[in-house]
């Protein structure tokens, strides 16, 4: 009987993850868009990184007894913010600090926010997304601490980056 109960509890989580990462609006679609000549960068990143983060926030909410859809906007906002930070780090970070090669978006002709908005525009978009994420945290125990944690981790991703280092 315990096995059946665990399987029933896992079904909503499986549906959440599948809806966020599969099909025409999930990560598979986002990956396929890389082959297109023109891409809506927000839709593209929402389908990729945003979908992964939304799956995490929604699955976590469902596992904790909260309505998953109430956490979707938060996931999309922090996912897109993470992607913008990654794009900024790709042009202004160092391979030594990041532990991975830099300038890969340009070399592989991948859509990215820095190419679309410029360095300063991408940094402004990052700040807007962080504010959007803070506003999207549903009421819950630990809401303030969650906001502080998201802000701290997010800001650490872009700490020390500037348009001067991007131009170097």
Predicted regions located by residue number:
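All-alpha prenyltransferase/terpene-synthase fold signal
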Residues: 1-168
